[in-house]
């Protein structure tokens, strides 16, 4: 970060906007790489967007009428029906948790992604100059810690339901005797299945992070390389395209979650 009164260079501007407000930067943790180095801004905005989701759906649920619905109620009902149809088509088990979980994931990830459309300096500038907060990243899904935490949550549910539906022995048998149902192939099967199992949360979290981080970098580059009065020329076309990206990424995260949990509920014959 530049010294007080000193303007940031383009590279400094980019580095500054890609830095999280963390416990290490506040001097509360010794090292940025520490396990206990929490990214405060990512946590705050993930909670903030989660509360927005809860607030909107609670408001609609309290005011739902049998008559002519309002615009907000129509939008919420469309989202609920959209998610319910995808769960019905993809998930073939019986679990009342899956549809609410899929709805929560889709809406929450979408709202976190939407933060990428907030102008780059709209929140960091007043935070730094009025509140004394030196760093502020407002896109939680552009933080690998957030996306991997969500992916690990899905992974934990996968393991839980795999053991619950198939039993511990059935789950172990599925890992050991698939794809080759022969005792001599158990080490090879375990290698394949364990790698495949671990790749699911890794790809789930990294896919969302990679797409959102790349989008954030493009917005920052537009802001860093163009004068303030021309920044909209670079940012606006990308923002319009990015609306599609943030929606698709929320949908992909939701669908993969449904697919993985559906696989966990399948009773294997191996």
Curated annotation (Swiss-Prot):
It holds the Pfam family ATP-synt_A. It is a multi-pass membrane protein. The gene is atpB1. HAMAP family: ATP_synth_a_bact (MF_01393). GO terms for molecular function: proton-transporting ATP synthase activity, rotational mechanism. Keywords: ATP synthesis, Cell inner membrane, Cell membrane, CF(0), Hydrogen ion transport, Ion transport, Membrane, Transmembrane, Transmembrane helix, Transport. Its main location: membrane. F-type ATPases have 2 components, CF(1) - the catalytic core - and CF(0) - the membrane proton channel. CF(1) has five subunits: alpha(3), beta(3), gamma(1), delta(1), epsilon(1). CF(0) has three main subunits: a(1), b(2) and c(9-12). The alpha and beta chains form an alternating ring which encloses part of the gamma chain. CF(1) is attached to CF(0) by a central stalk formed by the gamma and epsilon chains, while a peripheral stalk is formed by the delta and b chains. It is found in: Cell inner membrane. It comes from the Bacteria. GO terms for cellular component: plasma membrane; proton-transporting ATP synthase complex. This is ATP synthase subunit a 1. Key component of the proton channel; it plays a direct role in the translocation of protons across the membrane. The chain crosses the membrane at residues 38-58, 98-118, 143-163, 208-228, 239-259. Belongs to the ATPase A chain family. PANTHER family: ATP SYNTHASE SUBUNIT A, CHLOROPLASTIC. GO terms for biological process: proton motive force-driven plasma membrane ATP synthesis. It comes from Vibrio campbellii (strain ATCC BAA-1116).
């Amino acid at each position: 970060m530049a010294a007080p009164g000193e303007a940031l260079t383009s590279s400094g501007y980019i580095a500054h906007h890609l830095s999280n407000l963390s416990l290490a930067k506040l001097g509360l943790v010794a090292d940025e790489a520490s396990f206990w180095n929490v990214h405060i801004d990512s946590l705050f905005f993930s909670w903030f967007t989660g509360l927005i989701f809860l607030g909107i759906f609670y408001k609609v649920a309290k005011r739902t009428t049998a008559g002519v619905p309002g615009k907000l109620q129509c939008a919420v009902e469309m989202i609920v029906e959209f998610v319910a149809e995808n769960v019905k088509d993809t998930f073939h088990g019986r679990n009342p948790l899956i549809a609410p979980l899929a709805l929560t994931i889709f809406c929450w990830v979408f709202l976190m992604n939407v933060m990428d459309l907030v102008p780059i300096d709209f929140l960091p500038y007043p935070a730094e100059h009025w509140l004394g907060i030196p760093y502020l990243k407002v896109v939680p899904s552009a933080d690998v810690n957030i996306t991997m935490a969500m992916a690990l949550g899905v992974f934990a549910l996968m393991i839980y339901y795999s053991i619950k539906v198939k039993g511990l022995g059935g789950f172990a048998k599925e890992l050991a005797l698939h794809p080759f149902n022969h005792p001599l192939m158990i080490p090879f099967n375990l290698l394949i299945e364990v790698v495949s199992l671990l790749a699911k949360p890794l790809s789930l979290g990294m896919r969302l992070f990679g797409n959102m981080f790349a989008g954030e970098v493009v917005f920052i580059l537009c802001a860093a390389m163009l004068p303030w009065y021309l920044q909209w020329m670079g940012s606006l076309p990308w923002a319009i395209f990015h609306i599609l990206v943030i929606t698709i990424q929320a949908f992909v995260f939701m669908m993969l979650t449904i697919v993985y949990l559906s696989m966990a509920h399948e009773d294997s014959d191996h």
